[in-house]
UniProtKB/Swiss-Prot annotation:
Belongs to the thioester dehydratase family. FabZ subfamily. GO terms for molecular function: (3R)-hydroxyacyl-[acyl-carrier-protein] dehydratase activity. This is 3-hydroxyacyl-[acyl-carrier-protein] dehydratase FabZ. The gene is fabZ. It comes from Shewanella sp. (strain ANA-3). Its main location: cytoplasm. It is an enzyme of class 4 (lyase).
Amino acid sequence: MSNQMNTMDITEILKYLPHRYPFLLIDRVLDYTPGESLHAIKNVTINEPFFQGHFPVQPVMPGVLILEAMAQATGLLAFKTMSDDVPPPGVLYYFAGIDNARFRRVVEPGDQIHFEVKMIKERRGIGVFYGEAKVDGEVVCSAEIMCARREINQ
């Protein structure tokens, strides 16, 4: 039995996600098991562009961006479940839905968010996932996320 972890650095992540600055919100994948789960991180710094207006005196990461980062983690898990190969050009996973989103505390500059997502089911290209975002082991956000596999014309 092997304890080898499946990881992804930023170079590998860029091969799977179409997002780029300022909307790429996953910095590293610490571990994943295709068809089961993925653990990724986002390092939150004061240099994030959204902190200029949210909020200048008391910077707080917008909750919708925490959810977007969680959705990006589910997209990575979906791709790794489909195949370990880099996806062909024009294949994307769209954020298709969200249920039971809850926010429990704020995320501030200096925090490191750990995203833990689990695949619940997949049917006809629609994946359903449960995700939690944690800072220092404390859940800051949880949600059920759906993503849809689509091929786009390039």
